[in-house]
A protein has these predicted regions:
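Active-site PLP attachment segment
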Residues: 231-271, 279-283, 398-401
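Conserved core of the PLP fold type I
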Residues: 65-210, 215-236, 241
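Short, solvent-exposed loop/turn segments at secondary-structure junctions
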Residues: 38-42, 107-108, 135-138, 187-190, ...
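Conserved C-terminal alpha-helix-loop-beta "cap" of PLP-dependent enzymes
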Residues: 328, 339-387, 400
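N-terminal small-domain helix-loop-helix segment of the aminotransferase-like
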Residues: 9-105, 154, 161-172, 299, ...
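Structural signature of PLP-dependent enzymes
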Residues: 270-276, 294-318, 347
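PLP-dependent enzyme catalytic core of the Aspartate aminotransferase-like
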Residues: 2, 81, 85, 89, ...
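Conserved glycine-rich beta-strand-loop-beta hairpin in the small C-terminal domain of fold type I
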Residues: 305-317, 329-344, 382
Length: 413
C-alpha cells in the first residue's frame, strides 16, 4: 500500500493491537486462562436487567425506532436531557444538554481530543501531559504525531501487607507552554489507582493556571459504572473534560462513550463526529436513558456491579498471596477498575519475557512496558518489573492462573 504519513503512523503494531490480538488468539484456544483482556464481566443479574429493558423498548417500538434512525451528531437528545438532569440532581453541577456529547466509545473520543488540543499549530508543537504513569494502554498510539505524549513518573508509597500505591509527584510536575492537555484516568487502568479529591483539585488548579483543559477518563468511575472502592467525589467544571463509557457498565458492544465539557468543546466535538462518522450509535443511550428514568441505574451500579468487582479483587489478592508467599511480590492497592497491578522486585528477567513464558504455560496477562506512555526515553526498570492481570474470571481460573504465575516466578527468583 502507498500510504500517506497519516497512514504510515497507524500501520505499525501498537500495544493496543497486540493486546487485542492476544485476546482473540486466547479465545480461540481452549484451556487458556484469560487474565489479559479488558472485557467486563458477564454478571447474570446485570444482564437480566439489560434484557428486561430491551424487552420494554421492543414492546414500545422504541428499539426499532432507535435502530432505524440517525441521531444528531451530538447524540440522542432525550438521553442528553436525562443525563444533564441526572448530574444536576446528583452533584449540583451547572450543566445542560449542550455540555454533553456521545461518541463511539471513549477510545474515539481520546483520538479526537488528544489530537485537537495537542500537536502542531502555528509552527510550535504541544503535547498531552500524563501526570502519573502507569496509565491506560489505549493512550499510547492515538497521536497523529508520534511524540504527542509526555508523562511524569509516579511517586511510590509503600503500604502495609505488601501493598503499594502510586501518587502524583507534584514536586517534579512541570506544566509549561509545550503542554496542550493534561489527562488522567480515575480509577486507573492498569493499576487500579484512584486519584484523591485533593489530587484532582490540585491538577485542576495547575491546568487552569496553564490555560489547558484537564481530561478525566472516568471509564470505570463514579457515578457509573462505579467500579471504584474508595469514597470519592465526581469532578467537573468548565475547564474539565470528563469522558465516561457504557462499556464497563456491561455494554461494550454498544460502543457508547460520553463526553462532558464546556459548550465550545461540545460544539467542536459534535462537528468532528459529523465529519468522521455522521452520528454516534443510539442503542446504548436508549438503554441507559431508560435505566435512569426508571431509577434503576444507581442501584445496578451500587448493589450489583461494584460489589461484584470488589469481591473479585479481594479474591484475586487472596489467591495470589496463597500461591506466592514472597515479600518481593508487591500488589498495587486495588482501589477500582478490574485489574491487579503486580510489581516483582529482583525478578532477574523482564516481565516482557515473563509474559512469553506465561503465555506458553497457558496464562495470558499483559506486561508492564505498554502502560508507560511518554516514557520511551526514561528508565524502564520499573515498567519491566510489573504486569497487569484481569480479575473478572471465575475463582477456578483465577486460582489456576495464580498457580501458573507462582511456578514461573519460582524459576526466576
Amino acid at each position: 500500500m502507498n500510504l500517506s504519513d497519516f497512514g504510515q503512523r497507524f500501520n505499525g503494531y501498537s500495544g493496543i493491537t497486540h493486546l487485542m490480538d492476544d485476546l482473540a488468539e486466547g479465545l480461540a484456544q481452549p484451556g487458556v486462562i484469560m487474565l489479559g483482556g479488558g472485557n467486563p464481566a458477564s454478571i447474570p443479574e446485570v444482564n437480566a436487567v439489560f434484557s428486561e429493558v430491551l424487552d420494554k423498548l421492543s414492546a414500545s417500538g422504541e428499539l426499532v425506532s432507535t435502530l432505524s434512525n440517525y441521531d444528531a451528531p451530538q447524540g440522542k437528545s432525550s438521553f442528553l436531557e436525562t443525563l444533564a438532569h441526572y448530574f444536576r440532581e446528583q452533584y449540583g453541577w451547572d450543566i445542560g444538554p449542550s455540555n454533553i456529547a456521545l461518541t463511539h466509545g471513549s477510545q474515539s473520543a481520546f483520538f479526537i481530543l488528544f489530537n485537537s488540543f495537542a500537536g502542531r499549530a502555528g509552527g510550535s508543537a504541544r503535547r498531552v501531559l500524563i501526570p502519573l504513569v502507569p496509565e491506560y494502554i489505549g493512550y499510547c498510539d492515538v497521536g497523529i504525531d508520534p511524540d504527542l505524549l509526555c508523562s511524569q513518573q509516579a511517586r511510590i508509597v509503600h503500604l502495609d501487607d505488601g501493598f503499594f500505591k502510586y501518587r502524583v509527584d507534584f514536586e517534579n510536575l512541570q506544566v509549561d507552554d509545550s503542554v496542550g492537555l493534561i489527562c488522567v484516568s480515575r480509577p486507573t487502568n492498569p493499576s487500579g489507582n484512584v486519584l484523591s479529591d485533593s489530587e484532582c483539585e490540585q491538577l485542576d488548579r495547575i491546568a487552569t493556571a496553564a490555560d489547558v483543559p484537564l481530561l478525566i477518563d472516568s471509564a470505570y468511575g463514579t457515578p457509573f459504572p462505579n467500579i471504584i472502592f474508595e469514597p470519592v467525589t465526581p469532578f467537573w467544571n468548565e475547564n474539565c473534560i470528563v469522558c465516561m463509557s457504557l462499556s464497563k457498565l456491561g455494554l461494550p458492544g454498544a460502543r457508547t462513550g460520553i463526553v462532558i465539557a464546556n459548550e465550545d468543546v461540545i460544539r467542536y466535538f459534535s462537528n468532528m463526529t459529523a465529519i468522521t462518522s455522521l452520528a454516534p450509535a443510539g442503542l446504548g443511550a436508549e438503554i441507559v436513558n431508560r435505566l435512569i428514568l426508571d431509577q434503576q441505574l444507581q442501584p445496578l451500579c451500587d448493589d450489583l456491579i461494584r460489589p461484584f468487582y470488589q469481591a473479585r479483587a479481594d479474591l484475586a489478592v487472596s489467591l495470589l498471596r496463597e500461591a506466592i508467599d514472597d515479600p518481593r511480590l508487591h500488589v498495587h492497592k486495588p482501589q477500582g477498575s478490574m485489574f491487579l497491578w503486580l510489581w516483582f522486585e529482583g525478578l532477574g528477567i523482564t516481565t516482557t519475557e515473563l509474559y512469553q513464558r506465561l503465555k506458553r504455560s497457558g496464562l495470558l496477562v499483559v506486561p508492564g512496558k505498554y502502560f508507560f506512555p511518554g516514557q520511551e526515553a526514561a528508565d524502564q526498570s520499573h515498567a519491566e518489573a510489573c504486569l497487569r492481570m484481569n480479575y473478572v474470571q471465575s475463582e477456578a481460573e483465577l486460582g489456576k492462573g495464580a498457580e501458573i504465575l507462582a511456578k514461573e516466578l519460582s524459576n526466576c527468583w
